[in-house]
Design a protein with these regions (language model features):
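Nucleotide-activated sugar donor-binding and catalytic core shared by glycosyltransferases
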Residues: 1-196
Length: 196
């Protein structure tokens, strides 16, 4: 049922905490509604843990959308991600897996303002995504706080879908950053071996 012929897969990672899911799901559902007004050949695959599947399902069932699926099996998740034409992910280590499979993506994140303000005071980084932090620039688009809304998400995702060059450029850039990270990890392992 998931791998319907003539349908392109978009993988969606709405978070691993209930609080994140409750903030991001309404945004994601409204984004899918906007997409469905124009595009009719996408299936949205929500990657979830077994414990959060029901919560995500409740959001999907609350609206008239029939092109969403939820998966919680890790093997199926990897297979689905590999076959995806795009990924939308809450910031976190999952972005490394997305890049490893050469899937173009966007990072979204929203938290309550007090927590965000405290986090910004404690962590002085320009980006939240590990690829962007390593690159020192925005390789993967990030929609944070107020920018994390259905309209901006639709605008960026559709701009990628409509432009194969943009997709190719992002994949090339992420692969370059991944290779740099691998080299740095290998070098630090060699150094620690030499010093031990």
């Amino acid at each position: 049922q998931i791998f319907e012929k003539n349908k392109a897969l978009i993988s969606v990672f709405p978070g691993s905490r209930v609080s994140e899911i409750n903030i991001l799901m309404p945004i994601l559902i409204n984004f899918i509604k906007l997409m469905n007004n124009i595009y009719h050949d996408f299936v949205y695959i929500f990657h979830a843990t077994k414990q959060h599947s029901d919560l995500i399902q409740s959001y999907i069932k609350s609206v008239d959308i029939n092109n969403c699926e939820i998966i919680s099996d890790d093997k199926i998740k990897s297979h689905t991600l590999k076959k995806s034409v795009f990924a939308i992910a809450k910031s976190g280590t999952v972005s490394l897996e997305i890049c490893k499979f050469k899937v173009p993506s966007i990072i979204i994140y929203k938290m309550n303002y007090l927590n965000y303000f405290i986090a910004r005071l404690l962590v002085k980084v320009k980006f939240v995504n590990i690829i962007n932090i390593a690159a020192g620039r925005e390789v993967i688009p990030e929609l944070l706080q107020n920018k994390c809304n259905p309209k901006d998400l639709f605008k960026i995702v559709s701009s990628f879908i409509e432009d194969p060059k943009k997709i190719k450029e992002q994949i090339e850039n992420t692969q370059s950053v991944l290779n740099t990270l691998k080299t740095e990890v290998s070098s630090s392992k060699l150094a620690s071996k030499a010093l031990s």
